[in-house]
């Protein structure tokens, strides 16, 4: 959490970007190391240094790292897609889940159809028993989320998402019905 680079008098990315001296108690230093200048640049561009300072001062010290990582993710998403930001990524993933659920339902229907026809013919084994029924996992079985987000490597989800006109994911949003709306006609 604490930046070891301040011990060598290297300013944090925030102070370097803002062209000010990085003091020993700098609130940005633990979260914006000098090796990640784009992280602060994006956060500053979207939220502003003053607003981030106010936010960090209002939080408890153990909450600040998660807040900065969240701000950095949201800022990168907004820089990549000024219109939809994080909502574009969420909508894209929801549509992908919906499409895959339809594919799974179709495959299950095919399995059930073939299973019924082989059972009716008296074939040994019932294929219908093999139909996959997805079950939601109890919350205690979910894998832990990794709250650490590094801007040095781009988000895998955001890299897989196709880019539309102006970087928006308009063609993948549910309310567009597969038609990209050009020229801001919403």
Swiss-Prot record:
Keywords: Developmental protein. Induction: Positively regulated within the shoot apex by both ASYMMETRIC LEAVES 1 (AS1) and ASYMMETRIC LEAVES 2 (AS2/LBD6) and by KNAT1. One of its GO terms (biological process) is organ boundary specification between lateral organs and the meristem. Transmembrane segments: none annotated. Residues 10-111 form the LOB domain. InterPro entries: LOB. It holds the Pfam family LOB. GO terms for molecular function: transcription cis-regulatory region binding. Expressed in a band of cells at the adaxial base of all lateral organs formed from the shoot apical meristem and at the base of lateral roots. Not known; ectopic expression of LOB leads to alterations in the size and shape of leaves and floral organs and causes male and female sterility. PANTHER family: LOB DOMAIN-CONTAINING PROTEIN 4-RELATED, PROTEIN LATERAL ORGAN BOUNDARIES. Belongs to the LOB domain-containing protein family. This is Protein LATERAL ORGAN BOUNDARIES. It comes from Arabidopsis thaliana. The gene is LOB.
């Amino acid at each position: 959490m604490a930046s070891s680079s301040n011990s060598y008098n290297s300013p944090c990315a925030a102070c370097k970007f803002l062209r000010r001296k990085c003091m020993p108690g700098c609130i940005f230093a633990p979260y914006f190391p000098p090796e990640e200048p784009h992280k602060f640049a994006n956060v500053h561009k979207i939220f502003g240094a003053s607003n981030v300072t106010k936010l960090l001062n209002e939080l408890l010290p153990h909450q600040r790292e998660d807040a900065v990582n969240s701000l950095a993710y949201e800022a990168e998403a907004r820089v990549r897609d000024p219109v939809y930001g994080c909502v574009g990524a969420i909508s894209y993933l929801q549509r992908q889940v919906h499409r895959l659920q339809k594919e799974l339902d179709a495959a299950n229907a095919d399995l059930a159809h073939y299973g019924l026809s082989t059972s009716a013919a008296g074939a040994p084994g019932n294929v219908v028993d093999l139909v996959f029924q997805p079950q939601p996992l109890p919350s205690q079985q979910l894998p832990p989320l990794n709250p650490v987000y590094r801007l040095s490597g781009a988000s895998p989800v955001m890299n897989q998402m196709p880019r539309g006109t102006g970087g928006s994911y308009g063609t993948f949003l549910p309310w567009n019905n597969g038609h990209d709306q050009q020229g801001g006609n919403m």
